[in-house]
Amino acid sequence: PRTTLVALENTHNAAGGVPLTPEDMKSVADVAHGYEIPVHVDGARLFNASVALETPAAELVKDVDTVTFCLSKGLGAPVGSLLCGSNEFVHEARRWRKMLGSAMRQSGVIAAAGIVALETMVDRLAEDHSNARRLATGLAEVPGIAIDPEAMPTNLVFFTLKYSNHDEIA
């Protein structure tokens, strides 16, 4: 089958939370667009990438066609995500949403929480990253845990248990 979409995630949990740079994003987008294939970014942790790279989120996604990002993951809003793209794309997405019956009534209060998250919580992600490194540093002191705190640039902490049998540590 022919590829119809290239999807990226920034940051990606399987990559240890290491952010894709603007150059990485552009390289992928250039190849995909050369084949007339659109590029979508799952930006659930896009703002974490932005903070870690000290690069505006808009700069990270300027070469892609569409992006979604979550207002609750990391930013602290109770719910909500945004779908961003060209005016034509957003118009079509709204049409599909209405055809499929998806809607939320009286969502102004929840939308207000999303706006507060965007306006005030992005800067606090640096604290989240610092706390993750602090946790990783503490875990590195625990016998039986293998972890490299320096290899964690964002808020995701990964470690390996050195023991394969829990009886060995009991």
Say what each PLM segment does.
Residues P1-P149, T154-A170:
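Conserved PLP-enzyme active-site core in the AAT-like
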